[in-house]
Amino acid sequence: VPSLLRNFSAPVVLDCSYSEAELAHLLAHDSDPFNRWEAGQRLFGHLIRSAVVQLAQGETPTWPASVLAAARKVLVGVGDPAFIAEALTLPGEATLAEQMEVVDPEVLHQARTGLARYLASGLEGEFIRLYDAFAPLGPYRPVTAEAGRRRLRNLCLAYLNELDSGAHRALARQQFDGADNMTDQFAALSVLANAPGAEQAEGESALAAFYERWEHEALVVDKWLAVQASSRLPGTLERVDSLTRHSAFDLKNPNKIYALLRTFGANHRHFHAGDGSGYRFLAAQIAALDSINPQVASRLARSFDRWKRFDSERQRHARAALESIRQQPGLSRDVFEVVEKALG
């Protein structure tokens, strides 16, 4: 199987039609780190897009054993922990959407989650062993080697919590309570804040404890806002709307706007909700912000840039939201230009 452009540093667009099996082979065995990572991203993307088609046809996605074997080879091989974490991180929904002609965000979310759970189930034992093996060796130190260990350990925790397991959720809570650094605590919070069903109370408790500990650190509070705005749980829009009235949020503070509102605009599942509620909410926020800070409002309006990539019903809702912004009395030129370009 050819590994192309090895050690090549210049940006190159090269179209090579690898098969699924060839991509899995490169992910498992390529000695060029970038090519190995890219093979994984292409393989994961191909499988998720195929699953989208299956789900749209009412079928249950099937996942090949080859992707599990390749991921296991990466996970248990000798290598840089930071690279292993990077290689096994699935492409995000926004990246995947760019590779599709028409996007159904809900189906895309199901497909990506399905692959994550397939990997988590098939590699559960390996994830547990690595999580334990990379436990902190001592007090927190901001050095590169330990940062890589933390990153891989937190990836293992995230994968384990794709499974419906109280034991894995307890592991996240244990890490949250015992962490001596914000990185590990926030990684655990990200897991707990996305805990579904009856375990949502655990996430609420962790969010409250995190805010109480870090409320005087502005940049950490930004992360606290963002983790809620990026949630995949039902009710995320209502939570974000409520947070606009929280004392931690300030419509006059660009960092708070980016943390909460722009993050919500990047939340593929909830911003692009099929009923248009996410579009209407953000349009109202942009209109309110325009009279305070037109430049920031215009950046927020860029969340609508790719509305024409979605299905016709979502396009209808997005167009209506953009029109509502354009019709605002006294609309700034900054926002008008972004909206006009999007509508054009």
Locate the predicted segments by residue:
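Long, ordered, helix-rich scaffold segments
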Residues: V1-G344
